[in-house]
């Protein structure tokens, strides 16, 4: 069951990053792809954070972090290793941002960092929960 959930979540992320318009996918339930065989790869290095002042963009970036929080959890359940799950999630975050450039979307290192916030949040909560569990066992 974990494997199926993981595959479904990966499919959802890939669909979300490759479709022409994420908001079009959500609002009008339209999925369309526009492949760009020769993207401007220099766009990947753009680190413009001013976009985050737009409420819709900020909410979408929260979705980025949440998606990779969930992915890290699902990978951890599948692999059993938090470090492996975090590394796999980070590699997938990097891959999806580069992939977006080939589908007429904005893929950039800034979004990899935002994805890493979700990964780091799960990692931190995992470590915290593990410590608390260990403290409880030592206490009793």
Curated annotation (Swiss-Prot):
NCBIfam families attached to this UniProt entry: vanZ_1
Coiled coil: none
Biological function: May be important for peptidoglycan remodeling.
Membrane topology: Multi-pass membrane protein
TM spans (from-to): 4-24, 56-76, 84-104, 109-129
Gene name tied to this protein: ywnJ
Location of this chain's protein in the cell: Cell membrane
Superkingdom to which the source organism belongs: Bacteria
A GO-annotated cellular component: plasma membrane
Protein name, UniProt field: Uncharacterized membrane protein YwnJ
Induction info: Expression is sigma F-dependent.
Keyword Transmembrane helix recorded: yes
Annotated Pfam families: VanZ (PF04892)
Keywords (A to Z) from UniProt: Cell membrane, Membrane, Transmembrane, Transmembrane helix
Source species: Bacillus subtilis (strain 168)
UniProt xrefs under InterPro entries: VanZ-like
């Amino acid at each position: 069951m974990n494997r199926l959930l993981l595959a479904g979540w990966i499919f959802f992320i890939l669909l979300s990053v490759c479709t022409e318009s994420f908001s079009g996918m959500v609002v009008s339930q339209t999925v369309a792809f526009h492949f760009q065989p020769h993207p401007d790869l220099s766009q990947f290095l753009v680190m413009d954070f001013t976009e985050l002042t737009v409420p819709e963009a900020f909410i979408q970036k929260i979705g980025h972090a949440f998606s990779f929080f969930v992915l890290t959890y699902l990978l951890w359940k599948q692999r059993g290793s938090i470090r492996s799950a975090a590394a796999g999630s980070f590699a997938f975050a990097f891959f999806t941002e580069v992939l977006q450039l080939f589908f007429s979307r904005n893929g950039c290192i800034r979004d990899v960092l935002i994805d890493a916030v979700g990964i780091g949040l799960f990692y931190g909560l995992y470590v915290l929960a593990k410590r608390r569990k260990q403290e409880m066992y030592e206490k009793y």
